Amino acid sequence: MELEKNERINALFAFYQPLLTAKQNDYLQLYYADDYSLGEIATEFSVSRQAVYDNIKRTEKILEGYEQKLHLYAEFEARNQQADRIRDYVLSHYPTDQTLRDLIDGMENLEAK
């Protein structure tokens, strides 16, 4: 459960990072991406562990709020699932059609940007 939550927060952070303050960015980057402890972050910024914890929890709620309103991550996931289904279908029904493969690769490369 905790791993799923961490993965979700990291994904939301990737989508909505520009909307966060510098402090929110720093704390989440250190906590989730760089695996710092609350104490290490607190020491780094000369604040209490509780202040770091409160900021991280508040920022998690902000990220979830952005996702509830904008759905960027959910739509990204849906597009990726659909692209996977298309790729699987093409590979199983048209394995020698290089044009179809190239089109799918192009679509997937657009999504990766």
From Swiss-Prot:
Pfam families linked to this entry: UPF0122
Record InterPro entries: RNA_pol_sigma_r3/r4-like, UPF0122, UPF0122_fam_protein, WH-like_DNA-bd_sf
Domain of life according to the entry: Bacteria
Transmembrane annotation, as ranges: none
Family matches, as HAMAP family: UPF0122
The family this protein is said to belong to: Belongs to the UPF0122 family.
Described purpose of this protein according to its UniProt entry: Might take part in the signal recognition particle (SRP) pathway. This is inferred from the conservation of its genetic proximity to ftsY/ffh. May be a regulatory protein.
The name this protein goes by in its record: UPF0122 protein LAF_1235
Originating organism: Limosilactobacillus fermentum (strain NBRC 3956 / LMG 18251) (Lactobacillus fermentum)
